[in-house]
Amino acid sequence: MVECYNFSCQGESHKADSKPCQDASFSAVYEDGLAIAIVCDGHGGERYFRSDVGAKMAVEVIFDTVKTFTSSIDKSLFIGQPYTAVEAIASEEILKKQTPVDKAFRQLFSSIIYQWNNRIAIHAAHTPMSEWEQEHVPQKYLDELNSSETFEKLYGCTLMVYVQTPDYWFAFHLGDGKCISFQQQPFWHEPIPWDERCFLNKTTSLCDSNAINEFRYCYEGDGSFPMAVFLGSDGMDDSFGEDANLVNFYIQVVKMLVTEGRDSTIQSIESDLPQLSKIGSKDDMSIAFIYSMCELQAHIADFIQYQIDIVTDSIRQTDERLKQLESKIAGITSVSDEKTRIDFDYAQKDIERANENRIKLLYKYDVLMQQLSKVFTNN
């Protein structure tokens, strides 16, 4: 049984500036087996003062176009296809080599762009400037609202989508944020190719003039499906820093789903993400995911074992670090001069910190081993 969930919350910095949440998310599972997860992130910055509207409209457009796409496309186009990942188009030569699947996706993306532009044009034409906009937005950006050439920038946003049917799945992405997929081999990866243009505060966008060539996507129709796919806006990955930390958070979500149930997991996510924004990125947070509870239950030991392997490797690295520090101290025969004394003191403090970290890692290891033992006992 495939299930889904999504949640968006206002970022801590947005609360301070009285700015709305500029993220939007959606997820749904239908009786025919279609499952959809969407995350759209409206751009920050003074120029993009209606990006919250742009993100919401992007979600609506994507939902409509994907439903139409999956109901009208010949599924034989996907059936039997191995996992395939396609990067953003960098040249006209790539366009000439497109497969029938590539052409179908290009039509889907073109429809999304066209319908989104139509909706924001209607909104811009019929929605006067609010008091907040007049008070907080520089006049040069307010003037763009009346410009037929640049008004779409005011609504700019990114998008990330995962779609699963009984016969195939696909995902596509425009902009930043992270899509993480869990399956048996490799255990986790980012199925959608990354775009190096998305770096720091720079990102590709639905409002770009060349957006049609900036979509990246992937698909598979050979009978293999992920156990779970998580979509997270950049407020999520910016808070966790390294991908490994973000992956560990998603594993914790998976473990909680299996051991404590859906309701407790949702309650935890909706209380934790605002706090994570407060101590982390300060940005809006969005998460959406599709998962098979049966698959997660069957493979929960793999999730725990992955964490055990990570902790074991961290213990090994800490032990190597301790040996290096102890060797350094052993080589100091005299602390008569100031530089040697300072080096000696730093090495001792580093050893203390490494030992404290090792104790914490050993505790984590013990807890994880107990969790793994419990899984095998229950089975």
Place the predicted regions along the sequence by residue.
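Short hydrophobic beta-strand that contains or immediately precedes a catalytic carboxylate
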Residues: 37-40, 172-174, 230-232
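N-terminal entry segment of metal-dependent catalytic domains or homologous docking segments
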Residues: 1-67, 204-219, 281-282, 288
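C-terminal catalytic subdomain
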Residues: 201-379
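Short acidic, Gly/Ser-rich segments with clustered Asp/Glu that frequently serve as metal-coordination loops
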Residues: 42-52, 177-181, 235-243
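PP2C/PPM family metal-dependent serine/threonine protein phosphatase catalytic domain
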Residues: 5-19, 126-152, 156, 181-224, ...
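Active-site-surrounding "flap" and adjacent substrate/cofactor-binding loops of secreted or lumenal enzymes
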Residues: 66-80
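Catalytic core of PPM/PP2C metal-dependent serine/threonine phosphatase domains
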Residues: 78-180, 215-223
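A residue-level signal for conserved active-site and pocket-lining positions in enzyme catalytic cores
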Residues: 41, 159, 176, 234, ...
